[in-house]
């Protein structure tokens, strides 16, 4: 059992070292994802009711959108790290971090634009959110 523990520690250290250079980009992607999901829940008028502390109910909620969004996040992360692995295999010196940075930046822009669109649906009278959405999505009237 001790041999397996050493192998597991070696493999986990190698994986952690590989993802260490780009983990902050993934954190930023997760923040953008959370903003998009929360804005989507607000746009769909999902209500959370508390009955007692451990129990709560969710009204007007379908889990299909959240599952699709989680699949999308997984696909974005998988494709990004697949491209990082390909660039690393081509032996470019630390250029794979730039590829990850650009791809995750595009994904964060998508999440920001979609979240602002959901917030304009949730708060149609707030002009600041609408103006920010038009500015981010390049839709000038």
Regions from the PLM with identified roles:
Residues 39, 43-44, 80-88, 92, ...:
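Membrane-water interface at transmembrane helix exits
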Residues 18-25:
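Transmembrane helix interruption/hinge and helix-loop junction motifs
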Residues 1-6, 49, 53, 109-141:
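Membrane-proximal cytosolic segments adjacent to transmembrane helices
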Residues 50-75:
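Juxtamembrane helix-capping/reentrant segments at transmembrane boundaries
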Residues 91-103:
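Internal alpha-helical transmembrane segments of multi-pass membrane proteins
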């Amino acid at each position: 059992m001790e041999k397996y523990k050493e192998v597991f520690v070696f493999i986990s250290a190698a994986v952690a070292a590989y993802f260490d250079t780009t983990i902050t980009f993934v954190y930023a992607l997760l923040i953008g994802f959370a903003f998009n999901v929360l804005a989507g829940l607000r746009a769909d008028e999902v209500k959370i009711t508390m009955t007692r502390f451990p129990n709560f109910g969710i009204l007007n909620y379908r889990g299909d959108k959240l599952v699709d969004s989680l699949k999308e996040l997984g696909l974005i992360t998988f494709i990004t790290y697949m491209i990082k692995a390909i660039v690393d295999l081509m032996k470019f010196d630390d250029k794979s971090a730039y590829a990850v940075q650009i791809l995750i930046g595009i994904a964060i822009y998508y999440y920001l634009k979609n979240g602002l669109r959901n917030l304009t649906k949730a708060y149609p009278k707030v002009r600041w959110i609408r103006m920010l959405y038009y500015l981010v999505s390049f839709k000038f009237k």
